[in-house]
Amino acid sequence: MTALAAVVALGASLAGCGSSGEETTQRYSWPLATASPEDTVTQIFAEKFAEEISELSDGRMKIQVYANSTLGGDRDLLETCADGDIPFVVQNTAPQVSFMGDLAVFDLPCVFDSLDECREKIDNPEFYELISNVYTEGGYHLLGMADQGFRVMSTNKPVYSFSDFKGQKIRTMENSYHLAFWKAIGANPTPMSFSEVYIGLQQHTIDAQENPYEVIVSNNLYEQQDYVVETNHLPHLISLIVNDDFFKDLPEDEQEIMTEAAKIATEYAREQSDARIADKIATIEESGTKILTLDDQTRAEIRKASKSVYESIEENIDPAIYNAYMDGIE
């Protein structure tokens, strides 16, 4: 029996446990899967949700968290969640774009000047409802959205002005909008498996890469880099989703417990993310790697150069979602 089959069987059997006596309280246990290692904000988000579910239900409802791709990688988890085999999944939004194209709104570069501004937008009722509808149409129910801060650039070539991006060989994810962004600002983006990044930096087949601070430190990428540039080009968003049919079939009181647990877990994950980012920055600075920030002029030049990326995304997603995301952005 595969790990997934065993988990599905366990969840089904526990859902029916209990004696036939009228006073017996029905108890449930469901799996939640992530593709992330245990010491990450993604896992913190998942574990806090599970903790709150148990607390708010007085132990009647349980969530068993499976980390580190135990039940499959990001794509596998999305598919099994849509099928209902794994009710709950916590993962970043990037791999979800191929399933729900409107989520490409989160690939719009350099929209926000601060994480507070970004979180305010995510929590905006109008925008959140629009994004929730995207998940519903995909077969999911969005319970919450936390983050790992912004994605930043680490490199062996300093970036003090816009022209310093020119020619930098930077590893990116296999994402057409990400590739278009780095090309637009003059860099030479190269899609590469993440497992190859450290060696690529070590052997100088690439100059740079981009990721949240947590990834840069946990994978020791900073050891091979002289600089980290706070490009803050994209927020690294983490979604907590549940199979939509599964959620709708739950009694109203259990839906309310899940909604409240997700709200608490989202705020907790954000707080933990902020604290961990500060810790990761300290680790990088102590190593001798320099952290560079971009001035307003350079950020303005990046936005101007990225116009074609904005236009491409705008053409390919729901106009209402694009407009709601960009509302209030200069």
Model-derived regions, located:
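Bacterial N-terminal signal peptides that target proteins for export
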Residues: 1-4
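A gly/proline- and charged-residue-enriched helix-loop-helix capping module
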Residues: 116-132
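C-terminal motif of bacterial Sec signal peptides marking the signal peptidase cleavage site
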Residues: 12-16
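Alpha-helical assembly-interface signal, strongest on the long, hydrophobic N-terminal helix that forms
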Residues: 7-11
